[in-house]
Amino acid sequence: VDTVVAGNRERDHRTGFTTPPKLTLKSLMSFAAHPKWTLNYLLHEKFKLANVAHFTNKGSSIAKGVMEYINEQYDPAMSWKDAEYCIKRWQGPFALKGLMSVEDAKKAVDIGASAIMLSNHGGRQLDGSRSPFDQLPAIVDAVGGKIEIIVDGGIRRGTHVLKALALGATACSFGKGFLFALGAGGQP
C-alpha cells in the first residue's frame, strides 16, 4: 500500500533526466563542468537498475521508462480487504507502508498487520502530505503498543532517529543514506 501510483517526478521531467544520459547541449555543458564524473562514467561499467532493466527500453528516460514500468505494477484499486487477504495468506510479520492517519493505523491493527510504516517518501512522492513526524504523536496515542510503528521519510541522521523514538516510534527506516553510499560507489 506504499503508494497507489508512481510519483510525479517533476525535477526529472524538468531536467530531462535519462539513463543513460542523452547528449544534449545542456548535458554536454554539464559533462564539461564535471570532468572527473564524466571520465569515471565513460571508463566504468554503466549504471543500470538490474531488477527492472529487462522491462524497459535501452536509453529510455528514467522518468518515462522505468517509472512507467513501476507505475504499471501499482494497483490504484488496492483496498483494506486486499491488505487483509495478503496478511492472512502470508502468515508472518506484515508491515503496511504509507499510512499517515490515525484512522488508517487503527484499521491496520484491526486487520492484523504487525507493523505500519509512516511515510510520505521524504516529501518526494507525496509532497502535499504532512510529514511522518507531524503524524507520529497522534498515531502513537491511538495504536502504540498494539502494532510496531516505523517512521520512514525525513530520517537523515541519528538525531532524527532519537527524536522519532522519543515520540514513540518503534523503529526508523533510512533508505537515502544507503542510496547515497551506493551513488558514491563507496568513495568518500
Regions found by a protein language model. Give the residues of each.
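Catalytic cores of alpha/beta
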Residues: 100-112, 139-151, 155-170
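Glycine-rich loops and low-complexity Gly/Arg-rich segments
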Residues: 22-26, 119-122, 141-144, 174-176
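Structural detector of well-ordered beta-strand residues that form the stable sheet scaffold
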Residues: 95-97, 117, 150, 173
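Active-site entrance/lid segments in N-terminal catalytic domains of soluble metabolic enzymes
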Residues: 1-110, 122-125, 134
